[in-house]
Amino acid sequence: MIDTLLQPFFYGYMFNAMWVSSLVGAICAFLSAYLMLKGWSLIGDALSHSIVPGVAGAYMLGLPFALGAFAAGGLAAGAMLFLNERSGLKEDTIIGLIFTSFFGLGLFMVSLSPTSVSVQTITMGNILAITPSDTLQLAIIGFVTLAILLVKWKDLMVTFFDESHARSIGLNPNVLKVVFFTLLSASCVAALQTVGAFLVIAMVVTPGATAYLLTDRFPRLLLLSVSIGALTSFVGAYLSFFIDGATGGLIVSFQTLLFLVAFIFAPKHGYMAARRRAAKALEAE
């Protein structure tokens, strides 16, 4: 029995998949907490689809996919920030514009050279088939992103809570926003290989949403979110060996399951807690 449970650890491709998935899950969850704080969840969705033309272009030119994806993600993030500052358009309009424009361009590029572009890898991911060079790319992206987040998490928290206060204590909110969107683009690049473009949004939203239901303190929310992201990603990759199912689908399914449990049973913000408060209010009347 124990030998069977430990079997995935004896295969190099599975070991790589598990630790890389955990790293990517933790980073996406770290950023997820800030997206929840600012109400920017849809920006994660826009970026996850905006990197598609970069990936398609990289495949067509024979370049590392991460290079093209990061360039496209950075361009999309910069375009959203620029339009938000200068156009006067509403945020959801800007997100929709960037999302559809970049994704449409990506699909057009795929149609130009369908044999050189792995559509399935772009849309669904394939963490079990990553090459050593891809693993190195993801490791570099992951550890650099995580290091910056650990150093700057307080500055980002202050900026996202109150930009005026951030300026008053010497921080530059615009620079920190650029840093955040750069890190978000990097995490979307990493998550693309893990779960694909269609499911990246789940990895940068669900852990933060789950943690939000469980605590009101932001440092604790960060810790819970990262733990949820790393654990569900590891378990999803691990169980995919036995179930023979899509790793990305399993990861997102576990994250959704934890969210539903928290939504129902969270001690303060859960559905059952709200029902109890409503019942007590009726009794008091």
Residues of each region from the PLM?
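Transmembrane helix-bundle core of multi-pass membrane transporters
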Residues: 2-16, 87, 91-154
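Short juxtamembrane and helix-loop transition motifs at transmembrane-helix boundaries
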Residues: 3-12, 26-37, 54-64, 156-165, ...
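Loop-to-transmembrane alpha-helix initiation sites
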Residues: 17-20, 66-73, 92-96, 139, ...
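Short loop segments and helix-boundary regions at transmembrane helix junctions
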Residues: 33-115, 211-223, 242-243
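Small-residue-rich segments of transmembrane alpha-helices in multi-pass membrane proteins
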Residues: 50-60, 97-109, 129-130, 173-178, ...
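Helix-loop-helix "hairpin" substructures at the membrane interface of multi-pass membrane proteins
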Residues: 135-207
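Transmembrane alpha-helical segments in multi-pass inner-membrane proteins
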Residues: 198-249
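Cytosolic-side transmembrane-helix boundaries in multi-pass membrane proteins
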Residues: 245-285
